[in-house]
Amino acid sequence: IVSSQYQEKDHQCNTYMKLLDEDNDYIWNLDCDEIFKSRDIETIMEVLEEFKITSVGFRSRSFYGGFDNVLGGFEEGAEFMRIRKVYPGSYWATHRPPTIAHTIPIHERLPERHLDHNTLDEKLGVRMYHYSYVFPQQVKQKVSYYKAAVSKQNCIDDYFENVYLPWVTGSQSTRSRIEEEYDGVHEFKPSVRGSCRTKPFEEEHPEIILQNMDKLKKKFEDQLNEFRTH
């Protein structure tokens, strides 16, 4: 599903790269459902400055079917590349995986130094809060896009109807049955991704989510009711 004036994400991302100021040091690329805690943003900024990091990857707390459960397994173990050092003329070589290329000579750049997701999580306790499988409309659109244009044969057929919606609306026994059948609930086939089961979220949401939780939960219920009536 591709809409608007952009052919794909590479085209879209390189359009905004042209608008960066020459003195910009980093690009922190996020989707609209990716949130960070304020204190974690400050920590990252301090680390970038002190250690001259050129790229940062994050572990994700990926929420599923609401705000109380997250995905474990392969999703929790994956590294989400989100911060890259940029220079005048830098551009996206590709968005999958997120890769920035540079036009200035290599001797004018910082030595490559990556802060990986495991170190960031284990040493500094920083993760990305990813509300990627929360709202029914969001999930249906996301999976349709991946099935049509990105992952294609790697996606479970009729995922929204057979996995997500029955899991969200089902009893605990229904949820357990679904997770047993698919070794989790991620839209990729188990043979591709490995195990990816849900587990309770036992931490605190970022501030902006807490401030808007009532509205977000209402949005979730309103969307869910739309599918219940279909």
Report each predicted region and the residues it spans:
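Active-site-proximal specificity loops/subdomain of glycosyltransferases
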Residues: 1-25
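Catalytic-site signature of metal-activated, phosphate-bearing donor transferases
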Residues: 7-14, 35-230
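Short beta-strand-to-loop acidic/aromatic patch adjacent to the donor-nucleotide binding site
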Residues: 23-37
